Amino acid sequence: MPHTDYLFTSESVTEGHPDKMADQISDAVLDAVLAQDKKGRVACETLLKTGYVMIAGEITTTARIEYPKLAREVVKRIGYVSGDMGFDGNTCGVLVAVDQQSPDIGQGVDVGGAGDQGMMFGYACDETNELMPAPIQYAHAVTRQLAKARRGGLDFLRPDGKSQVTVEYRGGKVARIDTVVVSTQHSESVSNRKLHAALREEVIAKALPKKLVDRKTKVFINPTGRFVIGGPMGDTGVTGRKIIVDTYGGMGRHGGGAFSGKDPSKVDRSAAYMGRYIAKNVVAAGLARRCEVQVAYAIGVAEPVSVMVETFGTAAVPEERIAQAVREVFGLTPKQIIEGLDLLRPVYEKTAAYGHFGRTEKEFSWERTDKKDALRDAAGGKVRAVAGA
């Protein structure tokens, strides 16, 4: 029998974490290409270390991109604007090594085939209003609030930071928050006492549901003691190293492919978005309390080689009917995914921090639940939709 009483932990990082800086620069490049050339092909990687940014990849486009200017603008938006922080977007060096996409790949993609082989997963559950796992959703809430507090007056905070939230489950359902960890870069001058008090009052208390935090909830703030050296000065940042933060916090499987810096012809990204769209609509329709979808592709081939639906014993109708309904309602070729989710818009930099899923902004088309009625009808299920979904 599956465990029903357990602890589950997920982490999030702020936009100023060096790996997330790399993701945002890569996606800013993608947005700049799509804004000028919707047929552009982008596979952009970024690396950051003390004082410099390196942008590399394969980009085929008619767009004119000022890579150094673009990278520095992203760094400054994040908040690294002074050498005192260990990184300065005004003065950092930018090295560019960009080539065109291989024509061997292009010949398959241009006729609507997948840009690579691989398997992608989507997941949804009824633990939160956003139909996301509670641990990752609450971890993101903490890091978003940390950034908001930094911009809202806590000037001793710096852009780099992380959170970790452990949720206690009883009977398979969220019962309480057991542990919260917050680590944030800060100025040399701020005292630990002032920092801890501010983070408890302005970050943790405002980010997490009060009904889930009790006197037994453990809170750790900068457990190593101090966190003055951070950002790219403290750690090298590389695109695609926070794929679990980007998705479901470890709850639900991951195919291994990163998202940022990839145009929608790369099914690593677009099919993972479609997987989330499908799973969320299954849960929103009331067909299951938990749903995971796997799709897999061969490079240059349009139709997926496999589609699987897993509901972990929570289905309200036979799982085979849900799987058949998914095939009837959703188009799963790269072309159908791109058109159905309107993925050729320059919206990707926003996805590159605080998760690609569970977001409420209108740009996140894969978060819509507009297929729930069609799914319910196709599955033949007389079930009640999730409230508010």
Curated annotation (Swiss-Prot):
Cofactor note: Binds 2 divalent ions per subunit. Binds 1 potassium ion per subunit.
Signal sequence extent: none
Region (Flexible loop): 101-111
Family from the record: Belongs to the AdoMet synthase family.
Biological processes, Gene Ontology terms: one-carbon metabolic process; S-adenosylmethionine biosynthetic process
Binding site residues for ATP: 17, 160-162, 226-227, 235, 241-242, 258, 262
Binding-site positions, Mg(2+): 19
Top-rank taxon, per record: Bacteria
Gene: metK
Entry-linked HAMAP family: S_AdoMet_synth1 (MF_00086)
InterPro entries: ADOMET_SYNTHASE_CS, S-AdoMet_synt_C, S-AdoMet_synt_central, S-AdoMet_synt_N, S-AdoMet_synthetase, S-AdoMet_synthetase_sfam
Lineage start: Bacteria, Pseudomonadati, Myxococcota, Myxococcia, Myxococcales
Keyword Endoplasmic reticulum: no
Residues the entry annotates as binding L-methionine: 58, 101, 235, 266
Role this protein plays: Catalyzes the formation of S-adenosylmethionine (AdoMet) from methionine and ATP. The overall synthetic reaction is composed of two sequential steps, AdoMet formation and the subsequent tripolyphosphate hydrolysis which occurs prior to release of AdoMet from the enzyme.
Obligatory cofactor(s): Mg(2+); K(+)
Record Pfam families: S-AdoMet_synt_C (PF02773), S-AdoMet_synt_M (PF02772), S-AdoMet_synt_N (PF00438)
Catalytic activity, as annotated: L-methionine + ATP + H2O = S-adenosyl-L-methionine + phosphate + diphosphate
A molecular function (GO) term: methionine adenosyltransferase activity
Protein name as catalogued: S-adenosylmethionine synthase
